[in-house]
Design a protein with these regions (language model features):
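Sequence context surrounding c-type heme c attachment/ligation sites in exported
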Residues: 100-103, 118-261, 272, 279, ...
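A cross-family structural signal marking well-folded subdomains
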Residues: 13, 17-154, 165
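Short, surface-exposed glycine/acidic/tryptophan-bearing loops
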Residues: 35, 55-56, 260, 264, ...
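Structured segments of extracytoplasmic/periplasmic soluble domains
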Residues: 10-13, 24-29, 41-45, 76-83, ...
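N-terminal alpha-helical segment
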Residues: 8, 18, 73, 265, ...
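Single conserved hydrophobic/aromatic residue that forms the stacking wall/gate
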Residues: 1-12, 16
């Protein structure tokens, strides 16, 4: 949406006017441009668009489903923003934003129509929040099965704000066509990788954040219940143990809340300023993070605090 009024308010250094303008801009239908472009940059939704899911293996993954999976992410994020929900709703929510097409894809009953709508979900459905959405899960797969390393890197970079270690040179990817690998689960294959001295340190940090997603296949659907529960039970680099995505959500919200809060602030600043954050920005970032936390972690508070910060006004 146009920033002219916001810019004039900024020039006047009028905090109240800027905050009011934020509310107006968020309510404006043209805020869709912000939501889509920010989600594309922050969450790397483009990877979902680029991924060629094997439709012979996943016949329900039609081109209409593929399009709606990206729309789900946009609608969900916009709903959280416009309703001024907690930023932690982005991690875990008791609802999804879907239409009939996606409801049939996910296996969620009772949804009709093409419009995206708020649909309550129970824990047994294993949905809710960004990290169980098909756009992320399919976009970070190999088109058939889930890809734990891609998913781990995304979670560390986009959600926790960590920089994963780069792989050592000349280390081949896991080959799904290898007869030996075909007899092993992904968790077992990665365990073999960890036995290699050159791979051990990287995989010890990465694997736990990816293996929790082994409940979901390359299309973003739940794997059959026959999938070993042990594949999703992991020991985190911090020493804690989580089993599956539900416990990973709890871990992020309860134990890594500051990391997620800081990561989201940095990603939004990067988008708003059109540049990466640097060491010189750390003091201002810390102030935004502390203000956001003190005011209840509401999404609109995040935007208001950002646009009244020295970083934005310089």
């Amino acid at each position: 949406p146009p920033r002219s009024t916001l810019d004039r308010s900024s020039a006047a250094s009028d905090v109240y006017k800027r905050q009011s303008e934020v509310k107006r801009l968020i309510a404006d239908p043209r805020s869709w441009h912000f939501v889509r472009s920010f989600c594309d940059q922050w969450l790397k939704v483009y990877r979902h668009h680029e991924m060629q899911v094997d439709v012979t293996e996943h016949p329900s993954f039609t081109r209409f489903v593929k399009n709606d999976l990206a729309e789900e992410t946009y609608h969900f994020t916009r709903h959280v923003m416009q309703n001024n929900m907690s930023i932690f709703t982005l991690i875990d929510s008791d609802f999804v934003m879907i239409n009939q097409n996606l409801a049939e894809f996910y296996g969620i009953p009772g949804v009709q129509g093409t419009d995206f709508q708020v649909i309550p979900v129970s824990p047994e459905m294993k949905r809710g929040g960004l990290i169980t959405q098909g756009s992320f899960l399919s976009g970070h797969s190999d088109g058939n099965q889930g890809h734990p390393i891609k998913r781990a890197v995304w979670l560390m970079e986009r959600i926790l704000g960590e920089s994963p270690p780069p792989p050592p040179p000349n280390v081949p990817d896991l080959d799904p066509k290898d007869p030996v690998n075909q007899q092993l689960s992904i968790a077992q294959q990665l365990a073999i990788h960890r036995d290699s001295v050159s791979c051990r340190n990287c995989h010890k940090k990465l694997d736990p954040y990816g293996l929790v997603f082994e409940e979901y296949n390359g299309a973003g659907l739940l794997n059959p219940p026959t999938t070993s529960a042990q594949d999703t039970k992991v020991t985190l680099p911090t020493g804690g143990i989580v089993n599956g995505v539900a416990e990973m959500k709890d871990y992020i919200v309860q134990s890594r809340s500051r990391e997620f809060r800081t990561s989201l602030v940095k990603h939004l600043l990067t988008y708003a300023l059109g540049r990466d954050m640097s060491f010189a920005d750390e003091k201002d970032i810390k102030n935004i993070v502390e203000t956001l936390s003190a005011k209840g972690d509401r999404f609109q508070t995040l935007v208001e605090t950002l646009v009244t910060s020295p970083l934005f006004l310089r």
